[in-house]
Amino acid sequence: MLIEVDNIIDEIKAEISSLKEKVPYEPKLVSLVVEPDESTKSYLNSQKRNAKKFGINLEIVESNDLTNDLRKYNEDDDTDAIFIARPLKKGYTELDIAKYINPEKDVEGVSLHNIGSMFYEKELFVPCTAEAVVKIIEDTTDVRGKNIVILGRSTTVGKPAAIMLQRHGRDATVTVTHTKTKNLKEITKEADILVAAIGKANFVDSTFVKEGMIVIDVGINVVDGKIVGDVNKDVSEICQLTPVPGGVGSVTTAILMRNVFRAANNKKGDMQL
């Protein structure tokens, strides 16, 4: 069974419409690209389509000096929001982005300020994909007391999703696994909800899951010219599974667009660091 995300996207669109009324101009999003792979190009194409649809001025910049470009657009009054495409070029790390990006323009929620503030629920923005994961899970089931296993410990998905799912009011029990985790299949089979965010095409098959489990597929991989997830589609025969494409990625892009309008609206002085 495939999990539908249309209702979630409609709710985000409604929020965007409300924010647009408060922003009397076309907000500008700068997407910095270093060394895009096929999955990155696919996501940027999605950005282009959605930016046009929602009335966002999207500028995609091929960056040869990410640090200097971050400084440039941090200080540019015409730029409301900044996105950094992955993968990063050798020599750059996630910490470089976290240190240099302006938290007010950090619509991905990856700055040191926003990541640190997540522990106190005071962030300006949270990572878009992690928020998409949480929204889909909450739209599908009550997470209180649920056992959730996350495959992957990235700063954009695994770690922030774990923090948000454990917050008071959600109260899930979360296990974050990684490449060094032993007895991985035994751990995943004990979960009520499995989140796959490892970037390996069709890695999760029926041997990782149990019947009736909710499986959130975060993966965007290109195989033979087609986009596939981290989860084999056959898993949908015994589990509730988000589709790829059309699942987490679609919600993530909608959240990013909403965050651009939030950043533009916050320029008026509503934001408190």
Curated annotation (Swiss-Prot):
GO biological process, one term: methionine biosynthetic process
Top-level taxonomic group: Bacteria
Catalytic activity: (6R)-5,10-methylene-5,6,7,8-tetrahydrofolate + NADP(+) = (6R)-5,10-methenyltetrahydrofolate + NADPH; (6R)-5,10-methenyltetrahydrofolate + H2O = (6R)-10-formyltetrahydrofolate + H(+)
Binding site for NADP(+): G152, R153, S154, T179, I220
Statement: the UniProt record of this protein carries the keyword Oxidoreductase: yes
PANTHER family: C-1-TETRAHYDROFOLATE SYNTHASE, CYTOPLASMIC (PTHR48099:SF5), C-1-TETRAHYDROFOLATE SYNTHASE, CYTOPLASMIC-RELATED (PTHR48099)
Protein name per its UniProtKB record: Bifunctional protein FolD
